Amino acid sequence: TNRKISDIKGKIHIDIYNFIRNIYAVYNLKTDTLKLDAVADEMLGEKKDDFDWSKVKDILRDKSTASTFCRYCLKDSSLTFRIYERLYSLLEEISKGIGQLLQDVSRMTTGAVVEHYIMKMTVKENEVIPNKPSEFEVQDRLKRINIGAFVYQPSPGMYSDIGIVDFRSLYPSIVISHNICPSTIVHEGGNVAYKDKSQVFGLIPSILLSVLNARIDAKAKLKYEPNNNTLKARVSVLKLIANGFFGYLGYYNARWYCFECAGSILALGREYVNKVIERAEKDGFKVIYADTDSAFISSISKEQMNKLLSDINSTLPSPMELELQGVYRRALFVSAKGKEKGAKKKYALCDQDGNLIVKGFQTVRRDWALIAKETQYEVLRKILVENDVNGALSYVKRVIGDIRSLRVPLDKMAILTRLHKDASSYAQTGRHISAALSSGVKFSAGDTVKYIITKGRPGETVSQRSILFDIAKENNIQYDPEYYINQQVIPSVLQIFEVLGFSEGDITGKKNLSLNDF
C-alpha cells in the first residue's frame, strides 16, 4: 500500500512529529533540529538518556544490562507522550475549530487548516464550496508570480533610541477593510478593484472579521484566566488561521485561490508601510529599516512615537491599526555580502531592559558551529548591551587563541545540516554529504547530519576532512583549528566589526602592509 497514515482500530493515531514540523515549530521553536532530544529539551527542559549504540548487541545479549536499553526506550516514549500532552490543547482547538479529526489535524499544514476552516464557515453561510484545482490548473497557477512584500533596505551602522512600529494583523486587516475576496472582484479597464462592503461583504473578509473578533474575545477572557490552557490554545489557533489567509489565497493548490487578491493584498501592504515612512520623514525622523508590516525609526522618544502613531492611525480605515512594538536603546545593521547597502532581515537590538534580540545572524541559523554562534552572540551583546566595542574585539581574540590551542570542546565544533533528500541521491558531495556517506550510516530525507571538520591529510579537501561527530568523539579525532577560525568564527563576526570601522586584520592581529609601512 502507498498509504502513509497508520490506522489503528479503536484508536486515534496522532502524528506529533508532523504536527510540530508543519505547524508548531514554525512559530514556537528555536531548535536547530526536530530530533526528539532537541525538541524535548526546549519544550520540557529535559533530554533523552545517553546510549552507546555501538554496543547495543552486547547489551541485549546480557540479561543484566538489557534493562539499560529498555529504560532508554521507555524514556523516549515518556518524552514523546509529555510533548503530546503539551500540544493536546492546541490540537483539540484546531480540531474543534475546523471540524476535522485529531488524526487528520496532526498531519495538516497551515494552508490545509485555513481551507478546512473556510469550508466549515462556507457550509454555515449556505455557499458553494469550489472544487480542488485540476493538475492543469495547478500548472497554470505556478507560472504566475506576484511582487513580494515591501522591504526598505537599511543603511549599515549602529543606531540609538530606536522605535519600532508595526501594523496589527496587517494582511487580515487589509482583506477586511478593502473587502478583498474572489467574489467581490471588479475588473475595470485592465485594473482590479473590489466591490464596496455596502454592496456585498465578501465571504473571505467576513470570515476573517469573525476570526479577529473571536481572538479579541478569547484574549480578553484570558486576562481573567491566565492559566486556562484551552483559552491560550484558542488564541494561538485563531492567530494561526488569521495569518494564514493571505498565504492561502496565493497558494496554487487552494480551492479559493485568487492571484489578483494575493497581489492586491501585497500591493496595499507596501502602500501602507510607505505611508508610515513618508509620515515619519515628514516629521523629521529617520527611518532606518522597514519590512513587510513594520518600520524602524531612529533617534525618537517614546512620547514622540506615540504621537506619530496617533497621527497615522487617524488616517487608517477600520480595523487597521499601527502599534508600538517597542523602543530600543541600540540597534546594529550589517552590510549585505558584497554590497554597500544593509542586509535585509539581519539585525540585532538591545531593549530598555538590556535584553538582546537577534534576527538573521548565525546565532539563529542551524548550519554554523556552536562556537561561531556563541562568539557572534557575545560580540553583539558586548557591543549593544555593554556598549563595549573594544571588549568585543578582545573577546574574539581570546576565542581564536582557545581554538588554536585546542581548548574548545568538540561539542562546540559540531555543524548540523538537515538533508532534503536521501544522502545517496545528492549529485554533488558537500561536507555534510561526504560525512554521511563515508560513515556507512544510512541518512534519509529529513535527517540531520552532525559532523566536524578534521585536520585530515595534506591535499585533502574540506569535504574529505568532514566526519560524523559521533565517530570523531569516539575515536578522539581533533578538529582543524584553522578551518574553524577562518571559516566559522571570523566570518561570523567580520560584518559586525566592519560596520564599526574594523578590518579582518584588527581581529586576527595580521594587518596587511602597504608601501608606506616600509
Predicted regions and their residues:
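Low-complexity, acidic/Ser/Thr- and charged residue-rich accessory regions of DNA metabolism proteins
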Residues: A436-F518
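Short beta-strand
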Residues: K286-A290, L324
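Catalytic nucleotidyl-transfer cores of nucleotide-processing enzymes
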Residues: T1-K9, R21-I23, N131-K132, F136-L249, ...
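Active-site-proximal helix-loop-helix substrate-binding element of RNase H-like nuclease domains
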Residues: T1-S77
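Hydrophobic alpha-helical scaffolding
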Residues: V26-L29, C70-C73, R107-M108, S160-I164, ...
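Common nucleic-acid-contacting/processivity interface regions adjacent to the catalytic cores
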Residues: K57-S169, S173-I176, N229-E271, K275-R279, ...
